[in-house]
Amino acid sequence: RVCVDVVGGDEKPQVVLDGIEAALAADPDIEVLAAGPAEIVNPFAASHARVEALEAPDVIAMDDDPIRAVMTKRKSSIVLSCRAIKKGNADAFFSAGSTGAMTAAATAYVTPFRYQAEGKKQPVRPCLTNALPNRAGGLTVLCDMGANPDVEVDDMVRFAQMGSAYARVVLGIEHPRVGLLANGTEDEKGSNFTKACFPAMKAAVPGFVGNCEGTDLTSGNFDVVVADGMSGNIALKATEGAAKFLLQEL
């Protein structure tokens, strides 16, 4: 059962509603919890057998402060959807809305993964992940793509572990090859931070190959590329920009 934010994205709600209909047609087992204003979700749910309405009168705008919006707009589609997962009323949540609000709401309302460190269980910070097509005909997982501009070494290790799990479970890659984004492939390359991450990832991440460069997002030499949110977002946007330029020129 998937909860969908119908007021997220630039062309809401019609594009989102069209997407829900396409998903229902493609998968007879899927059920949808449509979250949004009553005047949108109630008639839509009434006309679709596998759709239930989740009335959410508040709307988090793209330019809202993410943390403040999550704490004050408690009846927004993003917050109520995350709470639906927490309560077991949904298995997954999709939104094309505010990335920051999604991250903040997931952290606040969905029980995070935890790991043992310094004698207590620490929450794992969420990271943004996507799978990019590569020249070998497969996909390369990039994480983090922008959720966490400032991170610690332990965070990078967890990102690598989560990225590897995603590559195995979702992409079916039995032994993912993991790379650390740096300014060169040599072990000694990188900033002081990436140099600190290197031995930690080598010790804790099976399949860790070593440093990789921005070109390895599409080279096919790595299945998972790990970066802090700032570097990962820059690498992603640079790749997108280059692709758009080439398509325009060809």
Question: What name fits each language-model region?
Answer:
Residues 222:
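Conserved beta-loop-beta/alpha segment of the NTase-like Rossmann-fold superfamily
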Residues 1-68, 74, 83, 87, ...:
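Anion-binding alpha/beta catalytic cores of soluble intermediary-metabolism enzymes, centered on
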